[in-house]
């Protein structure tokens, strides 16, 4: 039986050149399937607000939302390392709230680590949370909680000034104690440089093939998202028509009296 994955295992994978697989997950049955497939890391992302709740962005997601979905995933008892996103306003206002909310995701949610968006600006927060022995994954580049400042979901680091800022962000979060860093929406060459210079694993999403690992949203790879899928997404299945066919067949059989049959009934 596979043992539970730890942050030491993830760091060892970088050292040995083994790519790290990570997907978002928000519910018990999907977590079971992912773990059976051998996923290395599961992220309960605040993307749940977009793909599950139908919000236009991640900003409305609350701590209660994140704890609820983290609990659901953890009940599947995955061997994968479970990381929970800290949602907007859960760590930006003050250090006490940041520490408390990180602790809630561990204590109430059951996560093994938390993820925080930002670089130099959140380094003190990362340091404060890791001082509580809570592992932190940093997230730099295109940070969805900052979409209004960035003018939307735009690739970051394309000019020299932005690239230097991202290099500084990567150094800052590592120095602050993050055990891994997500690189989102940045040029592949810049991600490769950050990966080579970083002592911690890099997990890419729209950051090219040189990162130590990759993460995608589960609904995107299954073809279940109604909204536009970005260039970096690869669809591994198209389940929407499969689900639609099953629902349509059910409706038709109910209307025609073909379901339930004797085999679906009790004597």
Swiss-Prot record:
Reactions catalysed according to its record: 3-methyl-2-oxobutanoate + (6R)-5,10-methylene-5,6,7,8-tetrahydrofolate + H2O = 2-dehydropantoate + (6S)-5,6,7,8-tetrahydrofolate
Keyword Lipid biosynthesis belongs to the record: no
Record keywords: Cytoplasm, Magnesium, Metal-binding, Pantothenate biosynthesis, Transferase
Active site: 184 (proton acceptor)
Co-factor: note: Binds 1 Mg(2+) ion per subunit.
Pathway named in the protein's UniProt entry: Cofactor biosynthesis; (R)-pantothenate biosynthesis; (R)-pantoate from 3-methyl-2-oxobutanoate: step 1/2
Function statement: Catalyzes the reversible reaction in which hydroxymethyl group from 5,10-methylenetetrahydrofolate is transferred onto alpha-ketoisovalerate to form ketopantoate.
Protein name (database record): 3-methyl-2-oxobutanoate hydroxymethyltransferase
Gene: panB
């Amino acid at each position: 039986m596979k043992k539970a994955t730890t942050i030491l295992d993830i760091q060892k994978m970088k050292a040995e050149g083994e790519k790290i697989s990570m997907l978002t997950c928000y519910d018990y049955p999907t977590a079971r399937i992912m773990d059976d497939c051998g996923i290395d890391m599961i992220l309960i992302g605040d993307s749940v607000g977009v793909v599950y709740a139908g919000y236009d962005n991640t900003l409305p997601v609350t701590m209660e939302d994140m704890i609820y979905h983290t609990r659901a995933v953890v009940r599947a008892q995955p061997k994968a390392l479970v990381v929970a996103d800290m949602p907007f306003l859960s760590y930006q206002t003050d250090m006490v709230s940041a520490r408390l909310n990180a602790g809630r995701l561990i204590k109430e949610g059951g996560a093994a680590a938390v993820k925080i968006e930002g670089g130099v600006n959140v380094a003190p927060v990362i340091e404060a949370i890791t001082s509580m022995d809570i592992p932190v994954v940093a997230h730099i580049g295109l940070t969805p909680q900052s979409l209004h400042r960035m003018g939307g979901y735009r690739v970051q680091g394309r000019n020299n000034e932005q690239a230097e800022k991202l290099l500084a962000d990567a150094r800052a979060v590592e120095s602050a104690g993050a055990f891994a860093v997500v690189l989102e929406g940045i040029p592949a060459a810049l991600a490769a440089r950050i990966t080579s210079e970083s002592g911690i694993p890099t997990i890419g999403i729209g950051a090219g093939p040189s990162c130590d690992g990759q993460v995608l949203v589960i609904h995107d790879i299954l073809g279940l998202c109604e909204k536009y899928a970005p260039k970096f997404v690869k669809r591994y299945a198209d389940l929407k028509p499969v689900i639609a066919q099953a629902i349509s067949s059910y409706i038709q059989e109910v209307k025609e009296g073909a379901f339930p049959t004797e085999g679906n009934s009790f004597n």
